[in-house]
Amino acid sequence: MAFKATREQQAAIDTAGNVLVSAAAGSGKTAVLTERVIKKLTDKVSPVSADRLLIVTFTNAAAAEMRSRIERRLDEECRKHPDDIGLMRQRRLLSNAKICTIDSFCIDLVRENFEKAGVSPDFKMSDGYSLLPVNESVLSDILNRYY
């Protein structure tokens, strides 16, 4: 079944520039973002190259679902327009698109810029629990300083 956007959803799809889509679960965010990406990739005047995409989600499942939907929609467009080499190129470049979680995006950013960030190149991510003593210490310092 084809996605039928509401007026508000269509506005998000058509908005120029970067966009943040925030809405309740099941409201169509993934469908809106998928259509927005397809519109950008298939623009006849100034298409965005698929390998330049950055799509950030909160969960691995959401990132995988987003990539899968974009692939399916781009495949549909390629079947509709089999002679469009631009579409074929976009489909090929899609594997290089950065569609990931906020965590993995930030980790990659720090890894690529560890010197500028002033961290060791072999830094490790915390599981959260190991930071509890640090959090308590920082909280204590803040409370002592300001209260």
Locations of regions flagged by a protein language model:
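P-loop NTPase Walker
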Residues: M1-A117
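ATP-hydrolysis module of ASCE/P-loop NTPase motor domains
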Residues: R91-K98, F114-Y147
